[in-house]
Amino acid sequence: MKGSDALIMALRNMAATLGVYDLMEVRVFLERSCRFVQERYRAIYVDAYMSMVVDSVLDLKAGFSGTPEMDDARYSLRDALKRLDEINAPTIVGLTVLYRTYVKGEPLHPPGTPFPGGFEVEKKDGVHYCPVKDKQSDNPEALCDICIARQSPLP
């Protein structure tokens, strides 16, 4: 079994064990993580992240059969697991981050996620760009180092 197949199988097995309590736990985690986000963006972020979490779990429970993006990953799976442990991420957050990054090849902020200054995450020519990736490099709670998005070019 290839490493990518093993990862998908492990994520599917994890998703099968998740329930309502896990969703409540992730909601609390997200609200706590976003406590310093400007108020007008906070609800948007929490709702977007909750949607990603639910979609990821449902995809995995339904037997998502996409092509893993692990070969193109810029951040090792081992390092990603270490970072998730450092921030005490609930299991469901880890599942979502690993699924979106290493299986679906998607950024951790969905395209269209707004940021102060009128900027947002964009996808151009198959590449995801984030306007705040470099600015979050010193934030110990941010997972930007795991995310596949690149820093948006300066306007």
Swiss-Prot record:
InterPro entries registered for this protein in UniProt? DUF2115
In terms of domain of life, where is this protein from? Archaea
What does the sequence similarity comment in the record state about its family? Belongs to the UPF0305 family.
Name of this protein: UPF0305 protein MTH_811
Q: Which organism is it from?
A: Methanothermobacter thermautotrophicus (strain ATCC 29096 / DSM 1053 / JCM 10044 / NBRC 100330 / Delta H)
The upper taxonomy is: Archaea, Methanobacteriati, Methanobacteriota, Methanomada group, Methanobacteria
